[in-house]
């Protein structure tokens, strides 16, 4: 009897250790891989990735500051910095588009460390997620663009572009895209306030929390700029204009502006291998930062207003996404369900 009793503390100790180890596992992660050569094999984290018959040598980085003439997009595996929770992942294209592109999880888990954004057939068979949206030249979901009075345009020309992993903890991570010396294409309708001799500096930080599919987006400018905008694209991108599409939502709520879209399209140009995906996108802009609603052929947009804080001009908003056909248990399977979900989601945002 005494021997059995003495085993209990040992068993309980092992159980406690297992619980502790599980509780320490990260629930968010970041991914930022630069393409290299075999000569980079001594770098920390170096990996050899196989894409069909192609072999790619990569190593992780945390920041890249680049001249705008440099082809950063093609020098990065998955084309930019990325962040993920168990439910969703997002990447930021590192070029003039700076577009947000979503990756949906079929199984709630962290997986970019294994799939590197492009899961092979074996991983797909194990229930891994995948890219779900063809963004083309659109705003995607929650990218920051400029409204020239007729359509959205990319953030250019600039003196410098950068992307980086700002911070990462077990339950939260922040990634950033930034520019320096942006020569804003001002018009009479979008005047620029403040000194602009050296252009405008702007950073956009995207923060993801564990257990969330949404992100908070914080915009910081060296001077106020009228004409900044964000929003959601049409699905497909060459679909009906927002005003003619019943699967669009533009709604003024008591606490801000809610923009959303719903639709079905191929996620990539390879329609032979990939099936169409039904996707819901949304952006919520709190009332102090929500300006006029505008749209062009492929994007439903809201102009951003900013507040001056600590000699900087700041604004924030939120974005979210659902992969209705990709997820095992999606939060919505129809446009009506998606819009209802979003109204509940937006109520708690400020």
Task: Say what each PLM segment does.
Residues 22-23:
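C-terminal motif of bacterial Sec signal peptides marking the signal peptidase cleavage site
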Residues 1-8:
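N-terminal secretory signal peptides that target proteins for export/translocation
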Residues 27-156:
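Solvent-exposed N-terminal domain segments of exported/luminal and surface proteins
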Residues 229-290:
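Polysaccharide-binding surfaces and accessory modules of carbohydrate-active proteins
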Residues 164-171, 210-212, 221-227, 308-314:
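A short, structured loop/turn motif at beta-sheet edges
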Residues 202-248:
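Acidic (Asp/Glu-rich), glycine- and aromatic
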Residues 125, 129-211:
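Extended, loop-rich substrate-binding clefts of extracytoplasmic carbohydrate-active enzymes
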Residues 63-64, 70, 277-350:
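Beta-strand-rich recognition/accessory modules
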